[in-house]
């Protein structure tokens, strides 16, 4: 399953881990995705949404 937000499309980015001696090692920064039950067109579905979209109110959770 892809690490991509279903609302904004945010995905993994690459960067470096930098040690104290400034040696750099490649790494990936993955978005904080949560599995959320929401209503789309009157039907309950499960989406993987980043926390930034949840906090911004772009997705409304459904009571379990």
From Swiss-Prot:
Pfam family, any one: Ribosomal_L28
One Gene Ontology cellular component annotation held by this UniProt entry: ribonucleoprotein complex
InterPro entries from the UniProt entry: Bacterial_rp_bL28, Ribosomal_bL28, Ribosomal_bL28/bL31-like_sf, Ribosomal_bL28_bact-type, Ribosomal_bL28_sf
GO biological process: translation
Transmembrane regions listed in the UniProt entry: none
Matching HAMAP family: Ribosomal_bL28
Protein name: Large ribosomal subunit protein bL28
Native species: Bifidobacterium longum (strain NCC 2705)
Biological classification of the source: Bacteria, Bacillati, Actinomycetota, Actinomycetes, Bifidobacteriales
């Amino acid at each position: 399953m892809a690490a991509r937000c279903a609302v904004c499309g945010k995905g993994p980015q690459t960067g470096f881990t930098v040690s104290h001696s400034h040696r750099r090692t490649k790494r990936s920064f993955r978005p904080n995705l949560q599995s959320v039950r929401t209503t789309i067109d009157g039907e309950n579905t499960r989406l993987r949404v980043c926390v930034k979209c949840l906090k911004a109110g772009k997705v409304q959770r459904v009571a379990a």
